[in-house]
């Protein structure tokens, strides 16, 4: 189960935290009376703790992203990752050569800017899901194309399947979230 919210990006960090807490409370109403704090792992992945005890809140995961005036969060009962991007013109072929597998770069060369963001948002969402960050997982990263050479709907990460789903966002943006799912080989 998950909850995905998209807002106009608030200017202040305190407002972003308030929106996140409201999304968490809407997802898990029994936490509405619990004082919560956000902490981060050494790699930067955020998680919730009880403000009173300092213990990690189990069974609730979240990921946030913002770009081009939008701010989004996903709250889930399992590990998840989210990336939201305003699709701005960029030197995407050079970025693809630097950060992507050769086959991903070839796909991007054919698919253009849209293709670049299809791979980039999956890569960022997966990096947030793993908690390792974009550069932290570089040696372990899977190719994000399927057998037909299109952006993957799911990839194998360690002993799990991670599924990618695009989120409906305004034109000119692309958002992808990922989560674990039971799948047969």
Model-predicted regions and their roles:
Residues 1-185:
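Core catalytic alpha/beta fold that binds nucleotide/phospho-ligands
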